[in-house]
Amino acid sequence: ALIPSVIAFVQGNGDPSRYPMGFTIKADCKEEEKEFDFSKSLYFPQKQILCVNNHDILITHGHNEHIYSGLEQLYFKAQENFCKVVCYGHSHYPSNDYNKECTLINPGSCSLPRGGQPASFAILTAEDKFVDVAFIKIMESGFSLFNPVRFA
């Protein structure tokens, strides 16, 4: 069976929790007088848990889990939420870390890569019996698969 693509989004550090989708403009009002209609806004949660083909996947930005001090808090959050896969960001550094209970995936960054890594994103495939990740490097000439170097 063909399953549609799944898209999720979470709030990053410094991001507002809501983004207005529209605003009200009064006749002859100045730019600063526009009123945002927050009843029509996107809400960005701190985390999301998606179930894809019976795999619970935790999605979080990673700043609240203090990833620069290690990945232990991400492993703990996965265990706490009964997730076998965690997708996170914050470092803008692509990585695929795992232990016997959980896989941690950082897709890197399309616009602000760090640590000498290429601009990148990841495609996560969740089949019945396994989850696979492919890292895609963005180049001027197109796209290419690559294996990220382990985050140090």
Question: What are the language-model segments listed below?
Answer:
Residues A1-C110, A126-D128:
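Conserved catalytic scaffold of divalent metal-dependent phosphoesterases
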Residues Q46, N53, N81-F82, I105-A152:
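Binuclear metal-dependent phosphoesterase catalytic core
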